[in-house]
Amino acid sequence: MYELHIKPGQLTLSQLRKISRHALKVSLESSCIEAIHASTQVVNQVIAENRVAYGINTGFGLLANTRIAPEDLETLQRSIVLSHAAGIGELMNDETVRMMMVLKINSLARGFSGIRLSVIEALMTLVNAQIYPCVPKKGSVGASGDLAPLAHMSTVLLGEGEARYQGNIISGAKALEIAGMQPITLAPKEGLALLNGTQASCAFGLEGLFAAEDLFASATLCGAMTVDAALGSRRPFDDRVHQVRGHQSQIDSALIYRHILDTHSEVSHSHTACEKVQDPYSLRCQPQVMGACLQQIRNSAAIYEIEANSVSDNPLVFAEDGDIISAGNFHAEPIAMASDNLALAIAEIGSLSERRMALLIDNSLSKLPPFLVNNGGVNSGFMIAQVTAAALASENKSLAHPACVDSLPTSANQEDHVSMATFAGRRLKEMAENTRGILAVELLAAAQGLDFRSPLKSSELIETAKAELRERVDFYDKDRYFAPDIKQANQLLIEAMHNKLIPEGLLPSL
């Protein structure tokens, strides 16, 4: 259980990673309460003075010019939640929903949304009770915010919809009963405040970010293992090479390879006088490719961290000036572009891994037994495992197509440009799973290759990592049912055991 004390607008990437991985006990910094109350007072004043303000006493979208009678204001807020809960498809997992809820709490608590403290506290109560609304994955275009996902999240506050508790789907009414809550009657502006925002897109993006960091760590280890398994040179990782180019992420990537490979090993000493002049690109250019991927991970992380702490509601309430401004912070273009760029990194990490693995099974390049098995012909070894890796790499190439360039107008052309940030973030998990599968195959292949170099040893870190794998998967001495080996290697990667190999501060959330 992770105890999270929210100081609105100050969540860190390290905290966000923990939110994605652990059940929570959430509390709120008391200093934010005054700003929350002040924003609701501005909304109340607008109603008392009978002034027109979007979403408070008007319709929504193209119906913004429709004035709502005072007696219908509460009905308006309830109606927007119920009508906008129109998502479709598989449900988000609990971790994504929890992240979305915490991001919404963090945003609302900054005091620019005109929503009562009691509503924010109701969301916190659900999080603390580990009750997560059932939210379909599909149905948002990332402007005006993530309306459908956040509406599904909000239905439970009304005693409607469904929630998941201890792995079981229950009614919204039952969820409130378990949490010791009563259904909420939303005040003016509150339904819109709950629905408007980029929290679903950001939650998907953060989920992809943390997966990408884990993949980067594992891929660097696999790449280093493959260098020694293929009798590759350490010279391309020399710091001087990368300093003269100047890209910090490339410099850092080379540093990580040097850290894992160490200065030398018995394997590297064994071929210092070989006739090879230089290695194929998949070995030699790893810092350049992985450095570029690291840069995209860092860029995306910076954007996600800002967005996680942002106010993406509309309209915004500026209590100090008594102003309510209708604008467009709900437009998730920054997240869409961040997720698109992160998708490129995830795809390239997998693509490079597949090429390294293909090099290992090619006897003409690696000088290892063909397909990494003795008695080839009788045994096929890693032949089809490489085909699996190629299939996954190819899938990721299609999934990496930018989402943000594909806008479709909605709401009768009132919302005529949208971000598609939700899909941009959502596909990252599938891409990460594909890349993890590729890395699992390379991890097996690199360990197999190193075993063929026995009794020569690689670096201490690589030998330790290989031993961890060998606790789960034996040397492939002859053909056997291969899928369980890949599954075991994949599980090792899921456990993110290789993050410990990355020096502190080089990955954004670690």
Curated annotation (Swiss-Prot):
Localization terms from the record: Cytoplasm
Among Gene3D superfamilies, the record links this protein to: Fumarase/aspartase (Central domain), Fumarase/aspartase (N-terminal domain)
Pathway(s) the chain acts in: Amino-acid degradation; L-histidine degradation into L-glutamate; N-formimidoyl-L-glutamate from L-histidine: step 1/3
Uppermost EC category: lyase
The source's superkingdom equals Bacteria
Positions carrying 2,3-didehydroalanine (Ser) are S144
Catalytic activity, as annotated: L-histidine = trans-urocanate + NH4(+)
Give the sites of the cross-link named 5-imidazolinone (Ala-Gly): A143-G145
Which GO biological process categories is it annotated with?
Answer: L-histidine catabolic process to glutamate and formamide; L-histidine catabolic process to glutamate and formate
Query: Which GO MF terms are attached to this record?
Result: histidine ammonia-lyase activity
Keyword presence, Cytoplasm: yes
**EC number assigned by the record:** 4.3.1.3
Q: Which family does it belong to?
A: Belongs to the PAL/histidase family.
Instruction: Supply the name of the protein.
Output: Histidine ammonia-lyase
Organism per entry: Psychromonas ingrahamii (strain DSM 17664 / CCUG 51855 / 37)
Its taxonomic placement starts with: Bacteria, Pseudomonadati, Pseudomonadota, Gammaproteobacteria, Alteromonadales
- In the UniProt record, the gene name given for this protein reads hutH
